[in-house]
Curated annotation (Swiss-Prot):
Record protein name field: FMRFamide-like neuropeptide FLP5
Compartment(s) of residence: Secreted
GO cellular component: extracellular region
Main location: secreted
Organism encoding this protein: Macrobrachium rosenbergii
Similarity field: Belongs to the FARP (FMRFamide related peptide) family.
GO biological process, any: neuropeptide signaling pathway
Keywords associated with the record: Amidation, Neuropeptide, Secreted
Length: 10
């Protein structure tokens, strides 16, 4: 998990 938003893809 890199960021709360990007964790949906990455």
């Amino acid at each position: 998990d890199r960021t709360p938003a990007l964790r949906l893809r990455f």
